[in-house]
């Protein structure tokens, strides 16, 4: 995005500060010992740097290219195109950030453009490394020049921000898909029958007796020399619901620091599961904290990216009411085959959801992060030992979990 509205900014470089201190020193020295020649020379250098620097101050148009998202702890380049809009050359141009957001670290210095002719464009890249997931406003950098003597720095400050979404860490897991192929539909409208949704093309296979002639793939037939039929992702057997708990109990809160390892592990595990099952199962419903998100009308790739974006913003909470989103989720369980719980603690709301999933014919899997010594026990519908898998936050964050 191009930025032309800016304010002039004048600062002293380290060398300029030393020269200014020397000038002040000789000023007071002349009160005792005649040293007007040295003082005059120093003042002349400062005035020359001020006048020349002001005349040749950078007047550039900055065009920013910031990626929409990046995974936490991965380096990313922020690219800036500098176009000299003045009628005189600009020298020693450099980009400098006044202050990066907490959680974003600049890696290494930025390059310097030694000379930029009028109308010429140069590109500079700034490498940053996000330390925490979340949504960040990246401020526009100051385009500054310390020409001619590297004593004073003239710059232009642009008051604008670009949003950067930092996604949680995720990696591929070996997830069994045997439950995703179970026929669990007991009624309702299938995915392809919804008016606002079109079936997603999956590929083709050999034509079998009983297949609809309307789905014959003529191109594949010509290529393979055998009848072939089109396949679509239009059944509810490969649908899942993902539930991520963000209520952090006191036993999981660290004594110091803002980052909660258990919550980060839960979010990372949720992102990894969504990524790993994406080719075999689509996440239709995501209950992230108290918010229920529905992705029925989204196609496969943008759906996964949207889920990761939502998980990037999950915040810790001491408590929230789950009755309304839980009721909305329970009414949709007949449309999915698998319900995956990622919990920090257990309460009766999740017990009720687990029972509702069992009555709907869904298979449920519960991952309890840093589980307490005693679980919730058994209910009339569900056996704790059959569905709950205790996992360690350290194992998740270090990538030691390879198979679920």
Segments from the language model and where they lie:
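Secondary-structure junction/capping motif
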Residues: 9-13, 73, 258-261, 320-325, ...
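An amphipathic, basic-hydrophobic helix/alpha-beta surface used to engage anionic
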Residues: 44-295, 338-342, 356
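Short hydrophobic/aromatic-rich motifs at helix boundaries and adjacent loops
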Residues: 19-21, 38, 51, 173-177, ...
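Short, solvent-exposed secondary-structure boundary motifs
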Residues: 8, 219-221, 346-347
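Intrinsic-disorder/low-complexity, polar/charged segments
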Residues: 13, 28-33, 92, 169, ...
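Extracellular/lumenal glycan-associated context and N-glycosylation machinery
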Residues: 1-63
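Short coil/turn linker and secondary-structure boundary residues
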Residues: 10, 114-116, 213, 302, ...
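Acidic, glycine-rich A-domain
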Residues: 268, 274-404
């Amino acid at each position: 995005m191009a930025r032309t509205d800016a304010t002039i900014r004048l600062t002293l470089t380290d060398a300029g500060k030393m020269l200014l201190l020397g000038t002040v020193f000789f000023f007071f020295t002349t009160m005792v010992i005649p040293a007007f020649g040295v003082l005059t020379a120093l003042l002349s250098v400062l005035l020359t740097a001020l006048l020349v620097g002001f005349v040749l101050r950078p007047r550039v148009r900055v065009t920013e290219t910031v990626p929409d998202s990046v995974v936490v702890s991965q380096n990313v380049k922020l690219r800036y195109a500098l176009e000299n809009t003045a009628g005189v050359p600009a020298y020693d141009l450099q980009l400098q950030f006044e202050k990066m957001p907490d959680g974003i670290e600049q890696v290494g210095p930025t390059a310097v453009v030694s000379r930029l002719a009028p109308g010429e464009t140069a590109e500079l890249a700034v490498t940053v490394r996000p330390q925490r997931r979340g949504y960040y406003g990246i401020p526009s950098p100051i385009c500054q020049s310390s020409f001619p003597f590297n004593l004073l720095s003239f710059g232009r400050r642009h008051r604008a921000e670009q949003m950067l979404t930092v996604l949680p860490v995720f990696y591929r897991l070996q997830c069994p898909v045997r439950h995703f192929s179970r026929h669990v539909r007991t009624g309702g409208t299938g995915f392809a029958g919804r008016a606002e949704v079109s079936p997603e093309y999956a590929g083709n296979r050999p034509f079998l007796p009983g297949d609809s002639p309307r789905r014959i793939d003529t191109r594949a037939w010509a290529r393979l020399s055998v009848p072939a039929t089109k396949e679509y992702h239009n059944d509810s057997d490969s649908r899942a619901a993902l539930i991520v708990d963000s209520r952090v109990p006191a036993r999981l809160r660290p004594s110091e620091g803002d980052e909660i390892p258990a919550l980060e592990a839960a979010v990372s595990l949720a992102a990894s599961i969504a990524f790993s099952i994406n080719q075999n199962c689509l996440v239709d419903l995501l209950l992230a904290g108290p918010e229920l998100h529905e992705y029925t009308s989204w196609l496969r790739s943008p759906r996964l990216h949207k889920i990761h974006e939502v998980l990037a913003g999950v915040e810790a909470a001491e408590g929230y009411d789950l009755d309304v989103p839980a009721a909305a989720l329970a009414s949709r369980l007949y449309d999915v085959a698998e319900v995956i719980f990622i919990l920090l603690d257990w309460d009766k709301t999740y017990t009720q959801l687990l029972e509702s999933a069992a009555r709907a014919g869904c298979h449920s899997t519960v991952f309890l992060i840093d589980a307490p010594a005693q679980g919730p026990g058994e209910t009339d519908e569900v056996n704790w030992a059959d569905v709950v898998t205790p996992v360690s936050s350290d194992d998740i964050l270090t990538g030691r979990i390879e198979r679920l």
